[in-house]
């Protein structure tokens, strides 16, 4: 082939659009016809290979049952929390609502078949022959994990299809001339599919990072071409910012905005994990007394926990049968969560109290006693060691004695202010010294042991109901000591000054503007994503974490085969890994033998350039999509999560075979 390199000031260089000039990756009408036939053929073969009873069977898979339930939640406009972004649920919900398909399993099968169609187009884009491309289809379609996902309603089928569209669009952009109609068509497709991919599963964010890195590499090629003008470079940067960053990010935010605005019905089994701020959005304004008074019954919520209600159960510590267990509960509405606020020295009687002025409000810095309402025992800190944390500076928290016990210094707690900023615009507000429910973030300091009440994510064993451990520490980390008074029951029946709390705002009147502002939406958006992440590893799989300790280690994915895949598939599986190893060895040899001072012109081969260019893309893509799972905080990781990395390794294998064949 003719040498298409251009002459620079000192030596020849490769223009940024060398692939387009050489006709690399140019698709013909026949290629698109083949891709369409691949989709139809794969769909028909798998559909016909099973009976109608197989496709219409009840949801017999945990993943199907979960996805079906979430779809119903979305259609009912009920609140739910799940570890994945919302677009997959929205996609299947729209199909069910509009009755586009009578069976959602057919939709999943079509998405899997479309993934194969785009794989064929991708291999043709990287200049593989049709025979080599067909080999890639044979490899992926015979992976048992991939086949199984096409026969169930799957969280992954949509993500895999969008992923293949992203890779196809990106490779099409890399071989197209900047600013042409073809370039714009592919960058728009990339932008939309990328936005939908990150809105379907969070692994899409890794794909997003891969695309950004690849565009940085394209930018390097662009500025290395001396014939590219400054205007062209500026246009490239602006278009990349728009189509690679802004539009995908906007689609992601719009997807969540649609989800949040769809929540019209509260679901306590899920909403209990959300903050008071978020719950007021779901349940409406919450009316509470403007101050906390002695004699009130309260619930205390630990702000650093998913639910975290301070609770005591009629369970003794194994090491001390006289002391009653105190923990952070995962139940929102439970009698064990209720505590009476008692004065440290006065024995208050409310039978002759007829006016709010006769009630004593609790001030910051004052001491209180916390009596467990259902058992009558007092909250205390002692020198005994907690059941899980047994450091020298840790003290056990328990409930002790009975309802007649008045307590000593170990049962007295100073209430200290951490934060109180809601509706506090005045610097000299007389109400600032009082504790305010739903507003004041507080911590408790024990007078006897001189330690702070603390909750953390460590869970108690089965005898402690797998709830979170509570302890007292001399020098605690402040965020883990932060509590909020979530609800208050007054000790009297008459009316006292009340406030209405709604999405972080306080009003003393019944009329309130319930329209979401941008700041409120961003707060809800940020909290929902954070709770999704923690719900996944701490709630959904946290209690049963031990169950997954013997599961597939992520590091074993590349060398562990599916037992149900064909025998010949073993060679393709290990061959894909071998092709990446060989590529890295070739690149190492190139770097070792590189001499920047030589005056000799290196030989040029377009096939070699294609191999180097797309080989690096495959290596980086494989590594990013694989390495992210080694940092997972839990062990519930299925082999199907290796799909994106396997996809890149197969592309590397096919490109290597094509390079050898040519």
From Swiss-Prot:
Record keywords: Endoplasmic reticulum, Glycoprotein, Glycosyltransferase, Membrane, Repeat, Transferase, Transmembrane, Transmembrane helix
Reaction catalysis annotation: a di-trans,poly-cis-dolichyl beta-D-mannosyl phosphate + L-seryl-[protein] = 3-O-(alpha-D-mannosyl)-L-seryl-[protein] + a di-trans,poly-cis-dolichyl phosphate + H(+); a di-trans,poly-cis-dolichyl beta-D-mannosyl phosphate + L-threonyl-[protein] = 3-O-(alpha-D-mannosyl)-L-threonyl-[protein] + a di-trans,poly-cis-dolichyl phosphate + H(+)
Pathway: Protein modification; protein glycosylation
Protein's name in the database: Probable dolichyl-phosphate-mannose--protein mannosyltransferase 7
Top EC class of this enzyme: transferase
A molecular function GO annotation: dolichyl-phosphate-mannose-protein mannosyltransferase activity
UniProt cross-references to Pfam families, sorted A to Z: MIR (PF02815), PMT (PF02366)
InterPro entries the record matches: GlyclTrfase_39-like (IPR027005), Glyco_trans_39/83 (IPR003342), MIR_dom_sf (IPR036300), MIR_motif (IPR016093)
Family the UniProt entry places it in: Belongs to the glycosyltransferase 39 family.
Lumenal side: 1-26, 181-195, 257-482, 587-617
Function description: Probable protein O-mannosyltransferase involved in O-glycosylation which is essential for cell wall rigidity. Transfers mannose from Dol-P-mannose to Ser or Thr residues on proteins.
TM spans (from-to): 27-47, 160-180, 196-216, 236-256, 483-503, 566-586, 618-638
SUPFAM superfamilies named among the record's database cross-references: MIR domain
EC number, UniProt record: 2.4.1.109
Membrane topology: Multi-pass membrane protein
GO BP terms, alphabetized: protein O-linked mannosylation
Sites where a glycan is attached: 347
Membrane-side (Cytoplasmic) residue stretches: 48-159, 217-235, 504-565, 639-662
Residues of the MIR domain: 289-344, 359-418, 432-488
Localization annotation: Endoplasmic reticulum membrane
Major site of localization recorded for this protein: endoplasmic reticulum
An example Gene Ontology CC term for this record: endoplasmic reticulum
């Amino acid at each position: 082939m003719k040498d298409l390199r251009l002459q620079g000031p000192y030596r020849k260089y490769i223009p940024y659009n060398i692939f387009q000039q050489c006709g690399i990756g140019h698709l013909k009408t026949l290629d698109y016809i083949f891709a369409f036939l691949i989709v139809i053929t794969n769909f028909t073969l798998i559909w016909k290979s099973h009976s109608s009873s197989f496709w219409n069977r009840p949801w017999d898979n945990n993943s199907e049952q979960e996805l079906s339930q979430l779809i119903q939640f979305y259609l009912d406009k009920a609140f739910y929390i799940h570890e994945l972004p919302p677009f997959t649920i929205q996609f299947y919900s729209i199909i069910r609502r509009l009755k586009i398909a009578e069976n959602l399993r057919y939709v999943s099968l079509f998405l899997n078949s479309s993934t194969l169609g785009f794989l064929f187009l991708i291999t043709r884009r990287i200049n593989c022959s049709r025979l080599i491309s067909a080999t890639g289809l044979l490899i992926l379609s015979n992976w048992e994990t991939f086949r199984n996902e096409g026969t169930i309603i799957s969280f992954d089928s949509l993500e895999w299809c969008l992923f293949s569209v992203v890779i196809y669009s990106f490779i099409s952009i890399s071989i197209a001339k900047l600013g042409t109609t073809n370039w714009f068509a592919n960058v728009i497709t990339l932008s939309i599919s990328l936005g939908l991919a990150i809105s379907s599963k969070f692994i899409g964010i890794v794909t997003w990072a891969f695309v950004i890195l690849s565009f940085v590499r394209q930018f390097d090629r662009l500025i290395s071409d001396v014939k590219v003008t400054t205007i062209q470079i500026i246009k490239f940067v602006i278009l990349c910012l728009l189509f690679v960053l802004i539009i995908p990010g906007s689609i992601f935010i719009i997807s969540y905005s649609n989800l949040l605005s769809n929540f019209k019905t509260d679901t306590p089994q899920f909403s209990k994990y959300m903050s008071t701020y978020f719950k007021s959005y779901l349940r409406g304004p919450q009316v509470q007394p403007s101050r906390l008074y002695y004699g009130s019954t309260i619930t205390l919520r630990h702000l650093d926990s998913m639910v975290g209600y301070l609770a005591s159960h009629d369970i003794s510590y194994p090491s001390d049968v006289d002391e009653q267990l105190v923990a952070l509960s995962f139940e929102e509405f439970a009698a064990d969560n209720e505590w009476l606020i008692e004065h440290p020295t006065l024995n208050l009687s409310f039978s002759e109290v007829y006016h709010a002025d006769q009630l004593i409000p609790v001030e910051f810095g004052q001491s209180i006693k916390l009596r467990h309402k259902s058992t009558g025992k007092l909250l205390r800190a002692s020198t005994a060691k907690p059941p899980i944390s047994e450091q020298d500076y840790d003290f056990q928290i328990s409930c002790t004695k009975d309802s007649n016990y008045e307590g000593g210094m170990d049962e007295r707690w100073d209430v200290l202010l951490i934060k109180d900023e809601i509706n506090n615009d005045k610097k000299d507000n007389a109400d600032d010294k009082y504790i305010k429910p739903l507003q004041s973030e507080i911590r408790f300091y024990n007078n006897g042991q001189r330690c702070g009440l603390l909750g953390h994510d460590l869970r108690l064993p089965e005898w402690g109901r797998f709830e979170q451990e509570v302890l007292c520490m001399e020098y605690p980390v402040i965020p883990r000591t932060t509590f909020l008074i979530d609800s208050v029951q007054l000790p009297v029946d008459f009316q006292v000054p009340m406030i209405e709390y709604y999405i972080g705002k306080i009003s003393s009147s019944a009329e309130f503007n319930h329209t979401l502002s941008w700041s409120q939406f961003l707060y809800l958006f940020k909290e929902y994503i954070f709770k999704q992440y923690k719900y996944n590893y701490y709630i959904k799989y946290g209690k049963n974490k031990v169950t997954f300790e013997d599961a597939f280690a992520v590091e074993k994915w590349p060398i562990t085969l599916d037992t149900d895949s064909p025998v010949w598939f073993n060679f393709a599986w290990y061959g894909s890994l071998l092709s990446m190893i060989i590529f890295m060895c070739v690149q190492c040899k190139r770097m070792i033998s590189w001499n920047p001072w030589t005056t000799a012109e290196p030989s040029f081969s377009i096939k070699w350039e294609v191999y180097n260019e797309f080989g690096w893309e495959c290596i980086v893509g494989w590594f990013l999509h694989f390495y992210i799972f080694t940092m997972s905080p839990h062990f519930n990781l299925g082999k199907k999560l290796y799909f994106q990395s396997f996809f890149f390794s197969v592309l590397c294998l096919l490109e290597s075979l094509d390079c050898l064949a040519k």
